[in-house]
Amino acid sequence: MATHKELIKNGLWDNNPALVQLLGLCPLLAVSATVTNALGLGIATTLVLIGSNLIVSLVRQWIPQEVRIPVFVMIIASLVTCVQLLMNAYAYGLYLSLGIFIPLIVTNCIIIGRAEAFASKNDPLPAALDGLWMGLGMTSVLVLLGAIREILGNGTLFDGADLLLGDWATTLRIELFHVDSHFLLAMLPPGAFLGVGFLIAIKNIIDKKLADRQPKQEKTEIERARVS
C-alpha cells in the first residue's frame, strides 16, 4: 500500500497525469485559455476523481471482474452529472464557458485509469487520497498552462474570475500589459499544445538535474573464479 507521501509525490510530480501519463489532453488543450476556465475544470475533475476512487474502492468486492469497466463508467457519469448540476446552479457563467467539456469528464482517461489501476485494488482512504493528489496534479498543470496562455494572449491574469468565485472576484483581475491585438496562437489549441511541450521539457530538465545530484552507486567488481 502506497504511503501518503508517495501518493503526493506521484500525483504532483513523478506520475503527474498531464506531464507524465499524458492523459486528459483534450480538455487540457481546449479549456486552458484562461486561468478561470482551467481552475474551474480542474476543480470539477478533482471532485469526480475523489468521489469515483472512493466509491469504486468501497464496492470493489461486489463488482464482477467481467463488467467492472461499465460499472466504473456509470459511477463516474453519475458523479459528473452531480458536478454539472452544481456548476449550473452556482457558477452558471463558467458552466456556459466550459460547455461540452464538463460532461466529457466522463470519458477522461485519468479518472477511469485511476479507478482501474488504483482504487479497485486499495482501501477507501488511500483511494480517495490518490484521487485528490492526481486531481491536484492535473489542476496545477491546467492552471499553469492557463496562466501562460492568458498572459501571452491577453496580457491579463484571472480575467473572468467572477464566473467561478462570484462578483467580489472581479478585483482579482490583473492587467500585466496592454495589447492592441491578441496573440492568437497562444489562445488556440496549437498554442496550448506547444505550451504543454514546454512544461514537459522543463520537468524533464529538472528530473535530469535531480538525478545527476544523486550519488552514483559503484558496482562491485566481480572476480571470476578460476577453475583448475
Swiss-Prot record:
Its EC number is 7.-.-.-. Keywords: Cell inner membrane, Cell membrane, Electron transport, Membrane, Translocase, Transmembrane, Transmembrane helix, Transport. The chain crosses the membrane at residues 18-38, 39-59, 69-89, 93-113, 128-148, 182-202. It is a multi-pass membrane protein. It holds the Pfam family Rnf-Nqr. Signal peptide: none annotated. One of its GO terms (cellular component) is plasma membrane. GO terms for biological process: electron transport chain. It is an enzyme of class 7 (translocase). It is found in: Cell inner membrane. Belongs to the NqrDE/RnfAE family. PANTHER family: ELECTRON TRANSPORT COMPLEX PROTEIN RNFE, ION-TRANSLOCATING OXIDOREDUCTASE COMPLEX SUBUNIT E. The complex is composed of six subunits: RnfA, RnfB, RnfC, RnfD, RnfE and RnfG. Part of a membrane-bound complex that couples electron transfer with translocation of ions across the membrane. This is Ion-translocating oxidoreductase complex subunit E. It comes from Aliivibrio salmonicida (strain LFI1238).
